[in-house]
Amino acid sequence: MWISGCWKAEGNVQAEEHWTKLEGQSMLGMGRTVVNGKTVFHEFLQIRERADGIYYIAQLNDEPPVSFKLVKLNPNQAIFENLQHDFPQRIIYGRVIDGSLFAAIEGVEKGKPKRIDFAMRRLRCD
């Protein structure tokens, strides 16, 4: 899948994701958010095939893992969804023509729609 590799979003907050492709449709990933040079958030990520579909599984900090089912896949976009989760309910990855990666999380928080976008560029994986 085209999200394999290392990615970084910059701005007031820096976010990184590192993805490794496994066999089939499976991948392993790690994400972290850095503010003022300090990691304030980390997550372990998986994309895994199950009998009923493909799932994006995120385990944030020390919390239990949360699964999001793949609901849309085309050559340039993957959308994962879990409408029972508090926030986000949807995770979106998009491949941009310049080789960068677009990611977004969206859903409803405190009764109001919320969306956070990440424009990510490829890094060299160390």
Language-model segments: what does each one mean?
Residues P75, F80-N82, D86, I91-R95, ...:
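Well-ordered alpha/beta subsegment
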Residues Q14, P88, R115:
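Short coil/loop residues immediately preceding or within conserved phosphate-binding loops
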